[in-house]
Amino acid sequence: RNMSGLYFLNVGKTGSGKEHANTVIEDCLEAADAMHLRGPSGYTSSSAVLSALQEKPSHIAVIDEFGSMLASASAKGNQNKKDALTMLMEAWGRQTKTLRNVGYSMVQMTEAQKKSMQIEIKSPSLSIMGMTTPETFYEAVGAKDVASGFLNRILIVESKRPRELSRNPDQIDVPKIVTDWIRQVSTTQGEGASMISDQGNDFPPVPQVIPFSEQARTLLRDYEITITDRQNTSSPMIADMMNRSREVAMRLSLIVAVSLGDREISSVSAQWAIDYVDFYLRQTLEIMDVRISEGDTDGLRKAVAESIKESGSIGVKMNELIKAVPRLGNLKKHERDGLLAMVVEDFPVERLV
């Protein structure tokens, strides 16, 4: 089965308005009396993920400074944050199954204590809306995050718009058509089932099935072929980032179909989802190929090459390059010369002395 929970990430410059998504989500849920669907603003451990889902098996978490959370999880000694990301990965793929906690030693525990340690959430439905700046995000992630499978579960949308003057739009209430839709969709179940608010983590609601049309299946199959062909000609890191693109498109097509009120996922919904996912996937891959590295040296090498590339045919002087890539100035002269030699060898760059 294909469920609708997705992880989204807004990437934009400071002050670009990427936080507006949080405002819209909160305003709409509050107007529809559906704040019970609003989850925490982050997770500190795997137990925190499970506890939140145990209390609210279906919720959306809005996480500001998502890049900082990833950086914290990558820091040495922060195993709890690493475990939280692992549990988020598992929750993404367990929406039709059961999410369980990891095992702990239960020696000398009473039966009541043992029972309290065993947490199971059937059919958890977790959605995440993250926000971050490009600098924080791309400095926090590395090839290992792609290989682990965490990043390819996220639909990353980076805004390329330049900074703009603020606007003063009129304040309006959330339209009734929106609040009515939220109430309807958040309580929709299969025939003969009770209301979603009556359910707990042990009794998931009976889902309403929205089937794929034959035309939609064909489009998704063609997209899978396209993805596979790209993977076969890409580096391992880039290929790994495409592993779940088709599944993300399937989930998004379900969301589009439900938003349109359709009883079937049509070719229109499927094509829209494929186009949306693929556009931002290709944008993300292009950026990651330059900005995500296998280590500190690789990251610095790519940053220097990108800075030289941006200077165009006029080139860039050493003092300008150090200003653009401050980490280069921290190197000793022989280290810097060695790094520049790698850049000249690996990229279409010429050094004139």
At which residue positions do the language-model features occur?
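Phosphate-handling catalytic cores of nucleic-acid transaction enzymes
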Residues: 1-353
